[in-house]
Structure formats: structure tokens, C-alpha cells
């Protein structure tokens, strides 16, 4: 479960490698984030020369979780890691490439640009 102080791998080429969650957006006192939820995070590890620098505060959408999510047909989808994609305020990604699979639940939450850039949608 992703909450405050959780560390997420960054699944794009924005320059960040790892982020730490500061806040889960959506409602007062909301504790946990799942796939498709937006979080405010700070960059803990970054590649040199990237768009995003270490220490920067960014918004990110969760694209993979170890806990997984239940689908309407009763099946569960879960991944090997917790990962996110750094986004702008208009829900478009800051990077130009997405690495690894993303969940189909992002389509329901209008992250169509991330869906189109992803190599695999599960």
C-alpha cells in the first residue's frame, strides 16, 4: 500500500529514478494510493542532465503496485514493484518514454497519453 513516506520507482525518462511520497491527493486525510491515483512526491534519486532534479517536488501517477487491484471480473492484477510516472498539472507525462507495463485502470482515469506511450498495457 502506497502512503506517505513510501518510495516509488519512476517508470519514465524524466530524469528521476526514485521518489518519496509526500501526500496522497484526493480528499482530506486520505491515507493510501492505488493504481491511477495522483500523489505529490519529492525526487530522491535522479540521473544527471534530466528534466527533473533531485529535491524537486513533483506530481506523479501510480502505474504499478505490489498490492495490485481487483478487476470487475473478479481477477487481480499485481506487479513486482511500486512504480509511478511524473506528470504535469494537465495529466500529461513529463518524460517522453514509459518503461515497463502499466495497468488498464489508467484508461478509466483519463491518463490516455501514458497508455499510448506504454510498451504494454495489462
UniProtKB/Swiss-Prot annotation:
Mind listing the UniProt keywords for this protein, alphabetically?
A: Ribonucleoprotein, Ribosomal protein, RNA-binding, rRNA-binding
- Please identify the protein, giving its name as recorded: Large ribosomal subunit protein uL14
Q: How does it assemble?
A: Part of the 50S ribosomal subunit. Forms a cluster with proteins L3 and L19. In the 70S ribosome, L14 and L19 interact and together make contacts with the 16S rRNA in bridges B5 and B8.
Q: Which PANTHER family match?
A: 50S/60S RIBOSOMAL PROTEIN L14/L23, LARGE RIBOSOMAL SUBUNIT PROTEIN UL14M
User: Which SMART domains does UniProt cross-reference here?
Assistant: Ribosomal_L14 (SM01374)
Q: Which GO terms describe its cellular component?
A: cytosolic large ribosomal subunit
A Gene Ontology molecular function term for this protein is: structural constituent of ribosome
| Homology family | Belongs to the universal ribosomal protein uL14 family.
- InterPro entries noted in UniProt: Ribosomal_uL14, Ribosomal_uL14_bac-type, Ribosomal_uL14_CS, Ribosomal_uL14_sf
Q: What gene does this protein come from?
A: rplN
Amino acid at each position: 500500500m502506497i502512503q506517505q513516506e513510501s518510495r516509488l520507482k519512476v517508470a519514465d525518462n524524466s530524469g528521476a529514478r526514485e521518489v518519496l511520497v509526500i501526500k496522497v491527493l484526493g480528499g482530506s486525510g486520505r491515507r493510501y494510493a492505488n493504481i491511477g491515483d495522483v500523489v505529490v512526491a519529492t525526487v530522491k534519486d535522479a540521473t544527471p542532465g534530466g528534466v527533473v532534479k533531485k529535491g524537486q517536488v513533483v506530481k506523479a501517477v501510480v502505474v504499478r503496485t505490489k498490492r495490485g487491484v481487483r478487476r470487475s471480473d473478479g481477477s487481480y492484477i499485481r506487479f513486482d514493484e511500486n512504480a509511478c510516472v511524473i506528470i504535469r498539472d494537465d495529466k500529461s507525462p513529463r518524460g517522453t518514454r514509459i518503461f515497463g507495463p502499466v495497468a488498464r485502470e489508467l484508461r478509466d482515469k483519463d491518463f490516455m497519453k501514458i497508455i499510448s506511450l506504454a510498451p504494454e498495457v495489462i
